[in-house]
Structure formats: structure tokens, C-alpha cells
């Protein structure tokens, strides 16, 4: 459970702003915003989702900074409520919607701060997923870097040895590697994994649309990755009930439960959310499925700025997709400076004041 995960971390005083009030868009406004989100997804060629703890609360796993989050309750001297274990938690509608979006080629990559393993257990392909803070179900060989996805949580945290050894054969006829296996869960001062950080950075730079789901974007460097999309000329959509650190940079802000938003999005895209039929691990993405016919999206009479509430509703409308009325060039594909940062940044504290 996230409670046990949080308790297993080293003491750390500055966990960011916790317990901020939640904001809910009125139903009609939410519908219009999700229509616009569907339009952006259809218009984009490289969509990246950034996910946080808010996408797993519907499975019974509490978040950290929400009104009843683990750290919010801790600040109040109260015990957080939890309804399940990591092993018993089921992927949410949001997890399964992401699986289907990837299958039909509308989603290029997912960058996740979550350690609950639900992306992998939902069947989302691991080669299109960066788990920046680790996975409670994964252990890695310290010698050959082979990863093992287990059916139960590994049992240790902080990149510690688990007591098991690597069974990968070095070569035909030779004995197994027998390197020590370690968990993949980061503590506060641990450096982010080279491979996952490099993939997340490259995906964020090359995206023409980044969508954040259920994250306050307070933890660095994970929370700053969506800004790489903006710097390259792409769009940023933030879906969260609480204010986030990067709200002022968003082209569209949606305040609603992520499951409700994703359910409406899939409807507007003409896609079904697949049922979850038990844990399954998919190492590599399959060839994309054909997309269904695109349903006609109802036009919205509001610009992105009006939907965000930054322009009066009776002002002259601007083009929905581009602030200056002209379409910018597609973001230039950019490779990271190196395959993996030589000294990856540490998982550092949250910045104190969200914007």
C-alpha cells in the first residue's frame, strides 16, 4: 500500500504543499474541455502522458497530497485510510484507457511517478513506459541489469538487495549470472534510473502534446518534464483536481476525476475501454490496431484561454488550437545529450509554492 511505501522512505521534512483545496469544473464545462482534449489528441502525432498518484486512488490506493492523502493526513497527525494492498489493487479505467490508446497508436509514451505497478499489471508495454521512481513488483540484477517482474511486491525499498540472485545464463553452456537482485524503489536522495530518465526526457522533448494526469508536478525532475514539450513548441494539458506547479504553462486545464475525464475522452474518440482480465506483463508493444472511424466532435464556442478561465467569455474568440492564430511548426525531434545522463539528478524535494 502507498501507506507502507511512504513509511519505508527516509525521514524528509519538505514534501511540498499538501491538502490544497480541490476544484471541480461544472459538468457542462468539463464536457467542453474534454471535447477540446479529444480534438488535441486527434490533431497530434506524438502524445505523451505523465501520470501521478491521482490515477490510482479509484483502485483504493491513497495519493500523497490530496485532502485525504498519506502526507496530508500525516501533517494532521491522523492515520491515512487505505482500502487495498498493492497485490489486490486493480487497474483503474484510466490505466485501461491508456492501454487502448497505445494499442490504436494515439499514445506514444507514458512517464509515471507511480510505484504501484498498475501500469505494468494492466498490460501496458514496458518499452513505452518510464517508471521514474521504481516499481514495487520489480527487482533488478546489480551485475547485468536484467529486470524481473514479480507477482507480489519485492519486499525491500531504497535499492536494497532482496536476497535473490540473477538466473540469466551468461552464454550457452555457462553458469547463470548470479548477480545480486535489488529492488527498484527510490528513496528521497537516490538518483533516478538512467534508462527511464533518458527515455522520459527524450519522449517529453519530442512530444507535440503532453497530458498530465493526477499529479501536482511538485517533485523534481519528474514534474518538470512536461515543460520540455512546451519549450519545443508543443501543447500541455493538465488534468488534476488541485492546483499544480505548472498551471500557468498549460494550454488547457481540466478539473475533474481522471477516470471521468478519460471515460469521456474515449467516448469522443470512438474507443472502448477494455476490461482488465488479470495481471499480464507485456515487454514490447504490439503492432497498432486499426483505429475506428472518428466520431464528429461537436465544435466548442470557447477558445483554450476561455476554457481555462483566463479570458472573459464575451471576449472575441481566438482560434482554439493556437494562441497566435497560426500553427507553429511541428516540434523538432531532439535526441538527449547522451543515451543516459552521466550523473542523473536525484529525486529532490518539492518546491514550496505551487503556482
Swiss-Prot record:
Q: Where are the Phosphothreonine modifications? A: 294
In its record, the post-translational modification comment is: Acetylated at Lys-33. Deacetylation at Lys-33 by SIRT1 promotes homomultimerization and binding to double-strand breaks (DSBs) sites.
Cellular compartments annotated = Nucleus; Chromosome; Chromosome, Telomere; Endoplasmic reticulum
Matches recorded under InterPro entries: DHS-like_NAD/FAD-binding_dom (IPR029035), NAD-dep_sirtuin_deacylases (IPR050134), Sirtuin (IPR003000), Ssirtuin_cat_dom (IPR026590)
Task: Read off the SUPFAM superfamilies from this record.
Answer: DHS-like NAD/FAD-binding domain (SSF52467)
Q: What's in the keyword line of the UniProt record?
A: Acetylation, Acyltransferase, Chromatin regulator, Chromosome, Developmental protein, DNA damage, DNA repair, DNA-binding, Endoplasmic reticulum, Glycosyltransferase, Hydrolase, Isopeptide bond, Metal-binding, NAD, Nucleotidyltransferase, Nucleus, Phosphoprotein, RNA-binding, Telomere, Transferase, Tumor suppressor, Ubl conjugation, Zinc
Protein EC:
2.3.1.-, 2.3.1.286, 2.4.2.-
Residues modified as N-acetylserine are: 2
Region (Disordered) residue ranges read 284-355
The family database entries (Pfam families) matched by this protein are listed as: SIR2
Q: Which residues carry this modification: Phosphoserine?
A: 10, 303, 330
What does the UniProt record note about how this protein's activity is regulated?
Compared to the defatty-acylase activity, the protein deacetylase activity is weak in vitro, and requires activation. The histone deacetylase activity is strongly activated upon binding to nucleosomes and chromatin in vivo. Two molecules of SIRT6 associate with the acidic patch of one nucleosome, while the C-terminal disordered region of SIRT6 associates with nucleosomal DNA, leading to efficient histone deacetylation. The protein-lysine deacetylase activity is also activated by long-chain free fatty-acids.
Could you provide one GO biological process annotation from this protein's UniProt record?
positive regulation of fat cell differentiation
The catalytic activity, as recorded, is:
N(6)-acetyl-L-lysyl-[protein] + NAD(+) + H2O = 2''-O-acetyl-ADP-D-ribose + nicotinamide + L-lysyl-[protein]; N(6)-tetradecanoyl-L-lysyl-[protein] + NAD(+) + H2O = 2''-O-tetradecanoyl-ADP-D-ribose + nicotinamide + L-lysyl-[protein]; N(6)-hexadecanoyl-L-lysyl-[protein] + NAD(+) + H2O = 2''-O-hexadecanoyl-ADP-D-ribose + nicotinamide + L-lysyl-[protein]; L-lysyl-[protein] + NAD(+) = N(6)-(ADP-D-ribosyl)-L-lysyl-[protein] + nicotinamide + H(+)
| Gene Ontology cellular component annotations, sorted alphabetically | chromatin; chromosome, telomeric region; endoplasmic reticulum; nucleus
Covalent cross-link (Glycyl lysine isopeptide (Lys-Gly) (interchain with G-Cter in ubiquitin)), residues:
170
Q: Which residues carry this modification: N6-acetyllysine?
A: 33
Q: Where does NAD(+) bind?
A: 53, 57, 64-65, 71, 113, 133, 214, 216, 240, 242, 258
State the oligomer form and interacting partners: Homodimer; binds to nucleosomes and DNA ends as a homodimer. Interacts with RELA; interferes with RELA binding to target DNA. Interacts with SMARCA5; promoting recruitment of SMARCA5/SNF2H to double-strand breaks (DSBs) sites. Interacts with the mTORC2 complex; preventing the ability of SIRT6 to deacetylate FOXO1. Interacts with the CLOCK-BMAL1 complex; recruited by the CLOCK-BMAL1 complex to regulate expression of clock-controlled genes. Interacts with CSNK2A2; preventing CSNK2A2 localization to the nucleus.
Q: Show the domain comment.
A: The C-terminal disordered region mediates non-specific DNA-binding.
The entry assigns this protein to a family as follows:
Belongs to the sirtuin family. Class IV subfamily.
Tell me the function of this protein.
Answer: NAD-dependent protein deacetylase, deacylase and mono-ADP-ribosyltransferase that plays an essential role in DNA damage repair, telomere maintenance, metabolic homeostasis, inflammation, tumorigenesis and aging. Displays protein-lysine deacetylase or defatty-acylase (demyristoylase and depalmitoylase) activity, depending on the context. Acts as a key histone deacetylase by catalyzing deacetylation of histone H3 at 'Lys-9', 'Lys-18' and 'Lys-56' (H3K9ac, H3K18ac and H3K56ac, respectively), suppressing target gene expression of several transcription factors, including NF-kappa-B.
Q: What is this protein called?
A: NAD-dependent protein deacylase sirtuin-6
- Which source organism does the UniProt entry give? Castor canadensis
Amino acid at each position: 500500500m502507498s501507506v507502507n511505501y511512504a513509511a519505508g522512505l527516509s525521514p524528509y521534512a519538505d514534501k511540498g504543499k499538501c491538502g490544497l483545496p480541490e476544484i471541480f469544473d461544472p459538468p457542462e464545462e468539463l464536457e467542453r474541455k474534454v471535447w477540446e482534449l479529444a480534438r488535441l489528441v486527434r490533431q497530434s502525432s506524438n502524445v505523451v502522458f505523465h501520470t501521478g498518484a491521482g490515477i490510482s486512488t479509484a483502485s483504493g490506493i491513497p495519493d500523497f497530497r490530496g485532502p485525504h492523502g498519506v502526507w496530508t493526513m500525516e501533517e494532521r497527525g491522523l492515520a491515512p485510510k487505505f482500502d487495498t494492498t498493492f497485490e489486490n489493487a486493480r487497474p483503474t479505467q484510466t490505466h485501461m484507457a491508456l492501454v487502448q490508446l497505445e494499442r490504436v497508436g494515439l499514445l506514444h509514451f507514458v512517464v509515471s511517478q507511480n510505484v504501484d505497478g498498475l501500469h505494468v499489471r494492466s498490460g501496458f508495454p514496458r518499452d513505452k513506459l518510464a517508471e521514474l521512481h521504481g516499481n514495487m513488483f520489480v527487482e533488478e540484477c546489480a551485475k547485468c541489469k536484467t529486470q524481473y517482474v514479480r507477482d507480489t511486491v519485492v519486499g525491500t525499498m531504497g535499492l536494497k538487495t532482496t536476497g535473490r540472485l540473477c538466473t540469466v545464463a551468461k552464454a550457452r553452456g555457462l553458469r547463470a549470472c548470479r548477480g545480486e537482485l535489488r529492488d527498484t524503489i527510490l528513496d528521497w536522495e537516490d538518483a533516478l534510473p538512467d534508462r527511464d530518465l533518458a527515455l522520459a526526457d527524450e519522449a517529453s522533448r519530442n512530444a507535440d502534446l503532453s497530458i498530465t494526469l493526477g499529479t501536482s508536478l511538485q517533485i523534481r525532475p519528474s514534474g518538470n518534464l512536461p515543460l520540455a514539450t512546451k519549450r519545443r513548441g508543443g501543447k500541455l494539458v493538465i488534468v488534476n483536481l488541485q492546483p499544480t506547479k505548472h498551471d500557468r504553462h498549460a494550454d488547457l486545464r481540466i478539473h475533474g476525476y481522471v477516470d471521468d475525464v478519460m471515460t469521456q475522452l474515449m467516448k469522443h474518440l470512438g474507443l472502448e475501454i477494455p476490461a482488465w482480465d488479470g495481471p499480464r506483463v507485456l515487454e514490447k508493444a504490439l503492432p497498432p490496431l486499426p483505429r475506428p472511424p472518428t466520431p464528429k466532435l461537436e465544435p466548442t464556442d470557447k477558445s483554450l484561454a476561455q476554457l481555462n478561465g483566463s479570458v472573459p467569455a464575451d471576449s472575441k474568440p481566438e482560434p482554439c488550437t493556437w494562441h497566435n492564430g497560426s500553427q507553429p511548426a511541428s516540434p523538432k525531434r531532439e535526441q538527449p545529450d547522451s543515451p543516459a545522463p552521466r550523473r542523473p539528478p536525484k529525486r529532490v524535494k518539492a518546491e514550496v509554492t505551487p503556482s
